Amino acid sequence: MQQREEKQLEAFLESLVARVAHLKGSLQSFIYKLENEYDRLTWPSVLDNFALISGQLNTINKLLRNEKTPSYKSQVIIPLLLSPDRDEELAKLTEHRVPVFSHEIVPDHLRTKPDPEVEEQEKHLSAEAARIGPEVAQKQIQALNKLCSNLLEKLNNPREDRDSETSALRQNKPSFNPADTNALVAAVGFGKGLSKCRPPGPVAPGHPGQPMMQTGPTLQQVTIAGASGHQAGMSGPVAPQQPGQPGKIPSNIKTNIKSASMHPYNR
């Protein structure tokens, strides 16, 4: 009977070690991706890694809680040999995490109770909880239950209700300023509030607000002036421009006014 239990315990430990090794490999792979491939890592890939690690942890928990699993809690581990010297075989088995199995390391690795500091804090919290009266504790429990109920009710509400409330709030809240809108309409329609300033540029005399046209010679004027340059001696005076005639361009071209009966070869 004892040999059978020992074999079951060994088989259980081998299965547990294999599953822990798989979990360890998944963690190492995920940490490597986070440290070296973070620029190419996508959020769906991160979720897949988390799902894989969570599934492996759930499998280990199911294995430990299974009724057919031998009672490993009744097993006691006793250190048979303690040495302050470095143990290469132990370092190899623990991947150089525990190179020495000495008196300082054994309490940390084989402890079945919390640290003394943690145990003292637990005792202090237990004493504070014992000092609270039943009525005060009941009131605190009711307040906490009410808070949790309200939170669960908000979380369980349909999404449509939340969307309708949000749309109602948006409709009730104005999205514009009426004063600014009225000022803009008055400025565009009636020129209210606009400053009275003239556009840049010279203004023709007698017509304020109307810019004077450019008086530079055009291409046609330059051509005519070049063609009639040899008749400058035969040209007559140019009639001066009358002021107050808008749109009339003063010309520098000398015109040749002749009689209809005049001919250059008449003797």
Swiss-Prot record:
Sorted UniProt keywords: Activator, Coiled coil, Nucleus, Transcription, Transcription regulation, Ubl conjugation pathway
UniProt KW Coiled coil keyword: yes
Pfam family, one: Med8
GO BP term (any one): protein ubiquitination
UniProt biased composition (Polar residues): 166-180
Coiled coil, from the record: 2-27, 118-163
An example Gene Ontology CC term for this record: mediator complex
Function according to Swiss-Prot or TrEMBL: Component of the Mediator complex, a coactivator involved in the regulated transcription of nearly all RNA polymerase II-dependent genes. Mediator functions as a bridge to convey information from gene-specific regulatory proteins to the basal RNA polymerase II transcription machinery. Mediator is recruited to promoters by direct interactions with regulatory proteins and serves as a scaffold for the assembly of a functional preinitiation complex with RNA polymerase II and the general transcription factors.
The protein's name: Mediator of RNA polymerase II transcription subunit 8
Protein's gene: med8
